Amino acid sequence: MEPELLVRKVSALQACVRGFLVRRQFQSLRAEYEAIVREVEGDLGTLQWTEGRIPRPRFLPEKAKSHQTWKAGDRVANPEQGLWNHFPCEESEGEATWEEMVLKKSGESSANQGSLCRDHSSWLQMKQNRKPSQEKTRDTTRMENPEATDQRLPHSQPQLQELQYHRSHLAMELLWLQQAINSRKEYLLLKQTLRSPEAGPIREEPRVFLEHGEQACERDQSQPSAPLEDQSYRDRTTGELEQEDDSCHRVKSPHRSPGSLATTQKNIAGAKCREPCYSKSGPPSSIPSNSQALGDRLTKGPDDGRQTFGGTCLLQMKILEDQTPRGLKPRNHCPRKSRTQLSALYEDSNIKEMSPRKLDHKEPDCRTVRTQELGLSEDHIIWDGTLGGPEHSVLDLWRTKPPKGQAPTDRSSRDGTSNEPSHEGQKKQRTIPWRSKSPEILSSTKAGCTGEEQWRGRPWKTEPPG
């Protein structure tokens, strides 16, 4: 009977060792699981383990979280408590087995009974020794984890963090708004400073013109109260510019109609004769001596002597050339803007009303003087444009003298004849053939645009008509 008893004792010892190892493994798994939950949730308030031989984790709602906080803290602080909690069950089982063995083997010796009593007493001593150790561990857990003792701390800590985050967010928003306001102010100040210096040159730009005719017209409009001397000086300059443009235009367009040439000559003569008209805007005592002398000479009739009147016009042209500065003389032969300004000036109704009627009767005399400068008669002169050679390329002019109050008409033929009536009663026009001249004289006439001065004083040969 001894081997059977030995086997039973060894099997009971092995069962106790296996149970101890299994419980130890379960405790390690529980500790790892709780560490993971603490890392994710922050605390173990919602975790609860079920009762039984094999405990299972269970998560509680937030309402029951505060009630289970203390229990969870105790369980975490005493991981060995569960191990010894299961020992009483095993002890009862062991006692039952030992009682059965005693009842079955009542005939055993007293030595075996004493050994069983010693084993039972050893289990009781182990229980008594572990009770004070459990109380010590509970005190230490309370000191180490004060958050677990207070039910309000788990709720207040996340709320405090949220409030701090919200405060930092509001501070960043206010800082951003302040920076945006400052940048907007700097932009507006910079824009205002950039606009202020540009206002001056922009207002003065309309007064700047490249062409001298436009510059004179703009100054006349912007300065209505200018001195009379400057105004008369601008009038003389305008007349000279028109005279040069007319001569250049005649050279560039040899096939121009006689009606347009007569209109151009009339405008030139009107510009010369209107110089005294501008003197009404100021006191009569400030009129220059040259303009006054010219007005006195123009009021005289053609009966006083054609040579004297022609010399007066030539003298006036020289005076204008001497008084005109070089900067005001146009370099281009026929500037378009100058002609546009001059034509607008001639068509102005105010200037026409200011001019006296006596000067309008003297405009044909000025044209007569222009024809006498070339040594021609007062009759209509027609230069034949059908001739070949350099004469046709340089000058092909038709000069007519329309009657007063009648607009010239453009009726010309290619063979060099004209049907316009003359000023003295539709006289028969004489055709004067152009004599060949030297190429040097023709080239100088075309380049300088002053053909009247080049041919002045040269004899003209006329042939009888027919």
UniProtKB/Swiss-Prot annotation:
Modification Phosphoserine, positions: S438
Residue numbers spanned by region Disordered: 105-157, 214-233, 238-310, 394-466
Protein's UniProt keywords contain Phosphoprotein: yes
Keywords associated with the record: Phosphoprotein
Segments forming a coiled coil: none
Biased composition (Basic and acidic residues): 132-153, 297-306
Protein name from the UniProt record: IQ domain-containing protein C
